[in-house]
Regions:
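Interdomain hinge/lid region at the active-site interface
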Residues: 175-179, 190-279
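Short glycine-/acidic-enriched loop or helix-start segments at secondary-structure transitions
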Residues: 19, 41, 70-71, 100-103, ...
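Conserved beta-strand termini and adjacent loop/short-helix elements that scaffold enzyme active sites
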Residues: 32-34, 47-49, 113-115, 172-175, ...
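Short-chain dehydrogenase/reductase
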Residues: 146, 150, 185, 189-193, ...
Length: 279
């Protein structure tokens, strides 16, 4: 007897696995990832042949959107999934530049929403009870954002509410705003990290201990503790998200004729800090 699935999940990387863990207790999840090479995950059947992907009403897209050589965001895998599959409702969790969902809806005539992901690969345990998204468990997130036409976002809110319950905020907006908020967040975190790197150098030049300075600064609750640790041997920011996303939003708004001077300086300062401390 053929197994009946509720939701198809495209992509089983870090974000895809978090979405799978979130949904699995309430829905039958069909996973498709032809490039998955990780360890087997108990309870997850990972399909690699697109021809045997069953049609489900809902599909969640969690595929990579890497940075191209010209620093733009490569959305080709997302677009391929949506154009070459057949589902009633799509939710994109991959980070994509503003305007992508709107363009895909126009070109494919499909019902697509976007939801920024808040799953992180950081090294530190984040106290989710302090208004921060839990780094690995979406069931502990206190908000979920859905962008798109209201008829489509309402469907996805219904899917999510059956898992998350009544406690979180379910915010609905247009897709471009939902896409941009992810870039605003990561650009702010990158800027804050460079700001703290700069003040580390300022403190050093004045004979002041940065960690002592930092703790006094953080007595003001408006500052926030994230991104304030500085390691002399590894300065600036790195990883899979911040460099990619800051570069991508810079390139995207340049296409609209705007010069994001602050973010460009953040990238230049980051390169300087990285070059000075890495072998």
């Amino acid at each position: 007897m053929t197994k009946k699935y509720d939701i198809t999940l495209y992509g089983f990387g870090y974000v895809g696995q978090a979405v799978w863990r979130f949904l699995r207790g309430h829905y039958q999840i069909q996973v498709f990832d032809p490039y998955y090479q990780g360890q087997p995950v108990e309870g997850a059947e990972i399909g690699k042949n697109k021809k045997v992907v069953a049609k489900t009403r809902y599909a969640v897209v969690c595929v990579p959107t890497p940075m191209r050589k010209d620093n733009t965001c490569d959305t080709s895998i997302v677009e391929d999934v949506i154009k070459n599959s057949n589902h009633d409702y799509y939710l994109i969790k991959s980070t994509i530049v503003p305007g992508t969902t709107e363009r895909l809806v126009k070109n494919t005539k499909k019902k697509i929403a976007f939801s920024p992901e808040y799953i992180g690969e950081g090294k530190y345990e984040i106290p989710f009870w302090k208004d921060m998204p839990h780094p690995t468990d979406m069931k502990l997130h206190n908000f979920h954002i859905f962008g798109g036409s209201r008829t489509v976002t309402k469907k996805w809110v219904e899917v999510w509410q059956r898992v998350a319950g009544w406690s979180p905020i379910f915010a609905q907006t247009d897709s471009t705003t939902a896409e941009l908020v992810k870039y605003m967040e990561n650009s702010f975190l990158a800027t804050k990290k460079i700001f703290c790197d700069e003040f580390y150098n300022i403190a050093e030049s004045l004979g002041v201990d940065y960690n002592e300075l930092k703790e006094l600064w953080l007595l003001d609750g408006r500052m926030g503790r994230s991104m304030t640790l500085i390691y002399p041997e590894s300065r600036g920011f790195d990883g899979k998200c911040l460099p990619k996303d800051v570069n991508a939003i810079v390139k995207r708004v340049e296409e609209e004729g705007y010069n994001p001077a602050l973010l460009k300086q953040v990238l230049n300062s980051n390169k300087k800090f990285r070059d000075e401390t890495l072998p």
